[in-house]
A protein has these predicted regions:
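Extracellular Ig-like/FN3 beta-sandwich strand-entry sites
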Residues: 36, 61-63, 73-77
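A detector of long soluble domains/segments in diverse envelope-associated and cytosolic proteins
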Residues: 1-2, 94
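Glycine-centered coil/turn sites that cap beta-strands in beta-rich domains
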Residues: 2-19, 23-45, 53, 65-70, ...
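Solvent-exposed serine/threonine-rich low-complexity stretches and specific carbohydrate-binding patches
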Residues: 51-59
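C-terminal tail/sorting-segment detector
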Residues: 53, 67, 71-97
Length: 97
């Protein structure tokens, strides 16, 4: 019988939940890199407009953490996008003044 409870883990990247979320004015974004690769972490509004690039750099395997801090955003939901060579991860964050 096949085990239907198996969890498939990302091969190359893992994006942890941002915290705090909702945030004002700063949230922490942590992620794991399992192979050497160039990564971009960007923040988008719900219209799909890229409002910030948090990092666009070559990463070695390991655990990383960056902060997104913004006081001039309107209240609302934003999307964090972690894009590597072979995987893309997204996550919603909420900014509340």
């Amino acid at each position: 019988l096949a085990n239907t409870n198996q969890v498939v883990l990302p091969k190359y990247l893992h994006l942890d939940p941002a915290y705090p979320n909702p945030f004002n004015p700063t949230t922490n974004i942590s992620y794991n890199v399992n192979i050497q690769q160039e990564l971009e972490i960007s923040v988008f509004n719900l219209n799909g407009q890229k409002i910030r690039i948090l990092t666009n750099d070559y990463h070695y395997p390991g655990r990383y953490s960056i902060q997104f801090s913004e006081q001039n955003l309107p209240n609302g939901i934003y999307i964090i996008k972690l894009q590597g060579r072979k995987e893309v991860h997204t996550q919603k964050i909420t900014f509340i003044k």
